[in-house]
Amino acid sequence: MLRVFTASHCPGHSRTRRLVAALARQRPHLPLELVDLDEPEAERPSFVIGTPTFVWGNRILFLGNPAEGDLLARLDALEGS
């Protein structure tokens, strides 16, 4: 599962949301969760030290917003392995 951690104070917050929406359209089969750390019930793993953070399992894929093509290529590689 890809989990994307974000918060409203993050300068890239709007871009993160657009990127996640595009990803959901392009890879509808991909388990995906957008975690808004502003929500009181949101759980932040200790290894998430900034936002946005893109996490596959317990592995950080990107800290900061990647280019859409880079994100898609990385996810395709992970799903194929």
Question: Residue spans of the language-model regions?
Answer:
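Generic recognition of short, well-ordered alpha-helical segments
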Residues: S14-R18, S46, P66
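Thiol-based oxidoreductase modules, predominantly thioredoxin-like and allied folds used
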Residues: F5, P28-A42
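Structural micro-motif
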Residues: P45-G57
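Secondary-structure boundary motif
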Residues: R25-H29, A77-G80
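Hydrophobic residues in alpha-helical membrane-spanning segments
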Residues: G12, H29-L32, T53
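Non-catalytic, surface beta->alpha helical segment in thiol-disulfide oxidoreductase systems
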Residues: V55-S81
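Local sequence-structure signature of Cys/Sec-based thiol-disulfide redox active-site neighborhoods
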Residues: M1-Q26
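Short, flexible, glycine/charge-rich loop motifs used to bind or transfer phosphoryl groups or to couple energy/partner
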Residues: L23, A42-P45
